Amino acid sequence: MMELRVICIIRLVVACVLCLCIFIRSASSATEGFESIACCADSNYTDPKTNLNYTTDYRWYSDKSNCRQIPEILLSHRSNINFRLFDIDEGKRCYNLPTIKDQVYLIRGTFPFDSVNTSFYVSIGATELGEVTSSRLEDLEIEGVFRAPKDNIDFCLLKEDVNPFISQLELRPLPEEYLHDFSTNVLKLISRNNLCGIEDDIRFPVDQNDRIWKATSTPSYALPLSFNVSNVELNGKVTPPLQVLQTALTHPERLEFVHVGLETDDYEYSVLLYFLELNDTLKAGQRVFDIYLNSEIKKEGFDVLEGGSKYSYTVLNISANGSLNITLVKASGSKFGPLLNAYEILQARPWIDETDQTDLEVIQKMRKELLLQNQDNEALESWSGDPCMLFPWKGVACDGSNGSSVITKLDLSSSNLKGTIPSSVTEMTKLQILNLSHNHFDGYIPSFPPSSLLISVDLSYNDLTGQLPESIISLPHLNSLYFGCNQHMRDDDEAKLNSSLINTDYGRCNAKKPKFGQVFMIGAITSGSILITLAVVILFFCRYRHKSITLEGFGGKTYPMATNIIFSLPSKDDFFIKSVSVKPFTLEYIELATEKYKTLIGEGGFGSVYRGTLDDGQEVAVKVRSATSTQGTREFDNELNLLSAIQHENLVPLLGYCNEYDQQILVYPFMSNGSLLDRLYGEPAKRKILDWPTRLSIALGAARGLAYLHTFPGRSVIHRDVKSSNILLDHSMCAKVADFGFSKYAPQEGDSYVSLEVRGTAGYLDPEYYKTQQLSEKSDVFSFGVVLLEIVSGREPLNIKRPRVEWSLVEWAKPYIRASKVDEIVDPGIKGGYHAEALWRVVEVALQCLEPYSTYRPCMVDIVRELEDALIIENNASEYMKSIDSLGGSNRYSIVMDKRALPSTTSTAESTITTQNVSHPQPR
């Protein structure tokens, strides 16, 4: 009997142990792949609400001096009371998390309320996910869904104007279905809603994927439903938990959910709608409804019960900007109105490829080698995330190669580094320039493989020993090698170096490195003279030659046309940056000039603009930065510095500035005719019909101003905010490009420049620039193409008050242009007042400017030439019409000429002018 009892006890213990093991394994399996990081937490802990284990972030950032405590008002619902502040001058700081390649993940950053001025960006790898900005006293969460491209991923915080910060970072595996239509994209969460939810948030362990379902309040027009449901088969791996689905909204006729404040650029959105029929008495066909997204029907006759289950879900995609409207409308013949339990909205962002994997692994290996002897080195601490993309690492420069970036330059000079030169530097196969000078490196110089692409190596001013490796001297592409001021190195390589063509200091400490200008001065002068001479000859020939234009719309006939010569030889001043006189004004003087800011003439992103008069009687526009300005000191300094260095007839000159008592003021000449926007479709008091020749002249003037910026000596300038409101008109209607607060110097060859501050205005913004964040002059070209369409059509670039198909000027106009129906887009105010060839030149240029890929867009210099040709055609046609008028002919502005070619002045043939509509030539 005793033995039997013992056996029972043993079996009971074994059963308990097995149950415990199964429970532990089940719990472990449920959280497999979870990464939960509590930034600056005192220690690892278990969250009492979710029972998830959170670890501190000290394995990434051990410095506790940058830890801050979350404001007390926000502590009630938090387990981690701290956050990490990254006090950095520039760049990014990243958390590298382990992943499984090709697994889909959710990644979520939590950012505590800091201040109304919060503004910085976050990214997944090299793909910008969004901006952290908050004006409400609450936490902000940014969440993205992505497919892991490798076995780890970077989540980065990128500094803009303020130091970035973060309190929590969470990584969760997700089902594959989330990316079924966007396998190569990152999906940014816009909204995840538990309709009529009772609890604030539903997440893990109720939701095994730890999605956070936000409860929404019940709209006054809708009816809430709530039932305790069980034994429901929920098919689909993206299905919400049953606790979310047991509440719903319904209405006898329609449900509508409007999301405003979305980004104004076109993005694809994925909308996931979840339905669970809560009325057990309903049968299939009794609750049928149509589903619309932004008034576009996506599902017709949708019936939750049609498949025999009470549960159903659907995934819908749509392109939208600014807002997204989900509407469910009762179908004809249905007994009951629509129902919805929960939904998600995700924005699809293009995945930006990271640095070449080989280069990435090598430089990360090199960083680890350097850190062994340089634990607190400032340069190495700043090396975080991707070395090339979204703020390249200090000392690193990259170039594009086969769709990804490769490291071509490594400059760690004067970085206070010690220890041996990392051997991994020899594994950087695309490296061309290596500069490790002015450090404390010791030991031997590593050997480089003959396949190395190095063209310049500088190892001078270190503590290196031994002999210069033969492998370096014999590198096939090397043309400069400096290793002087290494007192322990042997200098017996002079003979070998003499036999090569390498520029070198021969290892001597007193040898001066030849400057590029000194070495190549004669060659540069000679080559430059030849190139300039050739350029002038070619330019003269191209501008003076007779152009043969094929007019496809007129039977394919060819008409020779003599093109006027419009060019000027560059003066010597054009090759040097001029110092323009910009006068500093006192605040007292500004207040006197504006009569205490009496006359307000405009408002902009920088602030208010007032009219004033200087002592000499010159009328001026005074731009005063407001306290709520979206632009700051950086934009003020940017415009001041730029306009102090440039001057051109078609750029608004800066007369002076004031920077006193926290006031930032810029002073310009007053432009009496306002802006191009005012004249085309501005306020009625400012609006005035511009005839076609005047519009063409304005377009040409603005193009010349932009071309001057793009060909600026030394380094071209990109405006970044080209639009009709930034093209001002003086008393003679001369166009002047204005507002240089966002302007930047163009990236030079070899730079790996990415601007997270994607600047511009909705309707004008280059989509390629926005998606890739790669800035170039062609971004201005795209915006100028929109301006040309404004000039032709008299319409604004975006107007959501028009029918949906006409919201975007570009998307509305393109089909008409491609169908050769340009008359359909021409401003009614100028119809009949233009020459067909001149108009087509402008329209064709606009279409080329609006090419989706910047490679296919023309440069501003080419645009200037095309517009010059168009103006010549228009002016010559006008002169011809004047001669007709003098003979008693018809008014030129009531007709359209039926030929784009100009009649010869010596021709005695009868005039071919007609008042009938003409067939326009096909766009080239």
Swiss-Prot record:
Substrates-to-products reaction catalysed: L-seryl-[protein] + ATP = O-phospho-L-seryl-[protein] + ADP + H(+); L-threonyl-[protein] + ATP = O-phospho-L-threonyl-[protein] + ADP + H(+)
Signal peptide: 1-29
Annotated compartments: Membrane
Transmembrane regions listed in the UniProt entry: 520-540
Gene3D superfamilies assigned to the protein according to its UniProt record, in alphabetical order: Galactose-binding lectin, Phosphorylase Kinase, domain 1, Ribonuclease Inhibitor, Transferase(Phosphotransferase) domain 1
Enzyme class (EC, first level): transferase
GO terms for MF: ATP binding; protein serine kinase activity; protein serine/threonine kinase activity
Keyword terms of this UniProt record: ATP-binding, Coiled coil, Kinase, Leucine-rich repeat, Membrane, Nodulation, Nucleotide-binding, Repeat, Serine/threonine-protein kinase, Signal, Transferase, Transmembrane, Transmembrane helix
Chain segments annotated as coiled-coil in the UniProt record: 361-382
Residue numbers binding ATP: 601-609, 623
SMART domains to which the protein is assigned, alphabetical: S_TKc (SM00220)
Active site, UniProt feature: 721 (proton acceptor)
Record flagged with keyword Kinase: yes
Superkingdom as given in the UniProt entry: Eukaryota
Ranges of the LRR repeats in the UniProt entry: 406-428, 430-452, 453-475, 477-498
EC number(s) stated in the UniProt entry for this protein: 2.7.11.1
Record GO biological process: nodulation
Entry similarity comment: Belongs to the protein kinase superfamily. Ser/Thr protein kinase family.
Official protein name in the record: Nodulation receptor kinase
Organism: Pisum sativum
Gene expressing this chain: NORK
